[in-house]
């Protein structure tokens, strides 16, 4: 009887783990469209634009006994292939570079967070907050 209970518990945990990691409520790491903002302190406006970023769920594990073993690295959804695009901020005074470059995700992967091409800080309360008045309506993909 104990063996049957152990087998049932093992089955439930494994099936539940597979369901949770592949469930419809957790979209996997992939490129998605996002609206971002760009500004320069010397220019009079903030420009919003649409680009492709990496977002989604990456399977991860947490140690049961964290005090005994070091923490496991947690993968994040990050760029696999990308190219850079640029926009020009209007109204910048002479001598100020009006160009702002940004990454455009072509494909994504789960891996370690690299500060050289990713923001590893997590979600922001106001990702589009600008200090300058907005100039909406630009679309870049």
UniProtKB/Swiss-Prot annotation:
Q: Which residues form the signal peptide?
A: 1-20
Which positions form S-S bridges? Answer: 29-77, 43-92, 46-130, 54-108, 58-110, 113-120
Q: Where in the cell is it found?
A: Secreted
Q: Which domain of life is it from?
A: Eukaryota
Do you know which InterPro entries this protein is assigned to? Cystine-knot_cytokine (IPR029034), Glyco_hormone_CN (IPR006208), Gonadotropin_bsu (IPR001545), Gonadotropin_bsu_CS (IPR018245)
Q: Where does it mainly reside? A: secreted
Pfam family name, one: Cys_knot
Protein's UniProt keywords contain Ribonucleoprotein = no
Glycan attachment sites? 33
Keywords per UniProt: Disulfide bond, Glycoprotein, Hormone, Secreted, Signal
**Any one Gene Ontology cellular component term annotated for this protein:** extracellular space
Briefly state the protein's biological role: Promotes spermatogenesis and ovulation by stimulating the testes and ovaries to synthesize steroids.
* Family per record: Belongs to the glycoprotein hormones subunit beta family.
GO biological process terms, alphabetically, are:
G protein-coupled receptor signaling pathway
Subunit text: Heterodimer of a common alpha chain and a unique beta chain which confers biological specificity to thyrotropin, lutropin, follitropin and gonadotropin.
Q: Which organism is it from?
A: Ailurus fulgens (Himalayan red panda)
Report whether DNA damage shows up as a keyword of the record.
Answer: no
Q: Which GO terms describe its molecular function?
A: hormone activity
Full protein name: Lutropin subunit beta
């Amino acid at each position: 009887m104990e063996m049957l209970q152990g087998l049932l518990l093992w089955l439930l945990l494994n099936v539940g783990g597979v369901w949770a990691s592949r469930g419809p409520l957790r979209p996997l790491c992939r490129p998605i469209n996002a609206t971002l903002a760009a500004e320069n302190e010397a220019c009079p406006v903030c420009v919003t634009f649409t680009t492709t970023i990496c977002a989604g769920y990456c399977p991860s594990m947490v140690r049961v006994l964290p005090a005994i073993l070091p923490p496991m690295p947690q993968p994040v959804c990050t760029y696999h292939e990308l190219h850079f695009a640029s926009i020009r901020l209007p109204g910048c005074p002479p001598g100020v570079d009006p160009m702002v470059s940004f990454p455009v995700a072509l494909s994504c992967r789960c891996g370690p967070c690299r500060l050289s091409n990713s923001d590893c800080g997590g979600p922001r309360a106001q990702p589009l907050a600008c200090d300058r008045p907005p100039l909406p309506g630009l679309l870049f993909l």
